[in-house]
Amino acid sequence: MNEIQKYISENESKMLEDLFSLIRIPSISAKPEHHDDMLACAERWAQLLFEAGADEALVMPSKGNPIVFGQKIVDPAAKTVLVYAHYDVMPAEPLELWKSNPFEPEICDGHIWARGADDDKGQSFIQVKAFEYLVKHGMLKNNVKFIFEGEEEIGSPSLEAFCEEHKELLKADIILVSDTSMLGADLPSLTTGLRGLAYWEIEVTGPNRDLHSGHFGGAVANPINVLCGMIAKVVDADGRITVPGFYDDVEEVPQAERDMITHIPFDEEKYKAAISVKELSGEKGYSTLERNSCRPSFDVCGIWGGYTGEGSKTVLPSKATAKVSCRLVPHQDHHKISQMFADYILSIAPDTVQVKVIPMHGGQGYVCPISLPAYQAAEKGFEKAFGKKPLAVRRGGSIPIISTFEQVLGIKTVLMGFGLESNAIHSPNENFPLDIFRKGIEAVVEFHLRY
């Protein structure tokens, strides 16, 4: 057992209790009724940053939820690492699928089970505990700043303006983020790219009230049927998105990268088994790993209308609504795609209904050069903690603010995430393995020593 491992072992009970104090706060940014919880979580984070060794930890106002800023400057001439994280979490529904209370963390089978255990309270806590270790042992050679927001899960609508206003405060050499996943517990990997995102709500309105389906069915357009028909046209039989101009700015995956992807250890049968599906689906001509990381995609995130209560009610509904999204790749502009999609849906809408397409949040994709000294330091950190060199992989998720950091602050980001697909982020029974939590702290400590 090395010194870092010994420190973690001796202090783990206190570490976990502090983490649990954050998790118990239901900081759900998507629900206005949790407004007070957002402030409570921000204040708790500021307190924990002070306790970890920050010289300054502030809860700062933004146009939306408060932002936590902390820092420790050891030498104005030294490099500065800006650690970004988010303290907001996804809603926990459907609650009936949870095996435990999502906001009362439990340890079972070597995992922490709770909403935010991974995304992003657990992962951001790794960063803070690594910082704490370095401060307490007099080993911190970099200046470290922290910026924790409370709106990542709703698209970070306030953070860009905050960054514009506080450019000098946020000045740094590199941004470090733990909010991504690895290929597996025994397959450490560093994320070198993220997809972008565009998100919409589609509202279809037909008659002025719900109608009797016997009296009107077959004569009046059903908004749910119409909505489903329009959505079905967005992706063709080859898995390609049919919106005109959608692929104009899509850069083909370089052959060298495609070759590298084929060498990534990936068991498609295990992948299917983990999510309980018999077969996979996607764009023709691309592998699963290419489809879910390097290529755009379209998904219906939610759809509703009509009667959904117990029993039956034979109605022809007045309204139907869907929330849909596209994952985008670097060079696709989410504003441009958002308008293209809205124009397309309106162009295929029949005159039998009224259709509204409401753009919601979005963000650009991001690629991290593996030649960055900070990337190489992160690579060494993983190698020290996991005993093997991490693979460099693109991931399919989106963190819209990452590209904004580069545009506004002029700083590149290293994505040093420790999540696993089996951690069920955004789903019931989110969890985080304690073994990965410990290794994560060790890896981040090594990053700071190497950078």
Give the predicted meaning of each segment.
Residues 207-210, 214-271:
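Polar, glycine-rich mid-to-C-terminal structural blocks
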Residues 118-193:
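Acidic/histidine-rich catalytic neighborhood of metal-dependent amide-processing enzymes
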Residues 63, 87-89, 111, 147-156, ...:
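Acidic, glycine-rich active-site loops and adjacent beta-strand->loop/helix elements
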Residues 184-185, 242-319, 330-342, 348, ...:
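An extended, acidic, His-containing surface patch that forms the Zn2+-binding/catalytic region
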Residues 189-205, 414:
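Flexible glycine/proline-rich, aromatic-decorated loop/lid segments
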Residues 87-88, 234, 238, 343-352:
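A common structural junction motif
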Residues 2-95, 319, 323, 336:
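N-terminal helical capping/dimerization or prosegment-like subdomains
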Residues 78-148, 439:
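Active-site metal-coordination/substrate-binding segment of hydrolases
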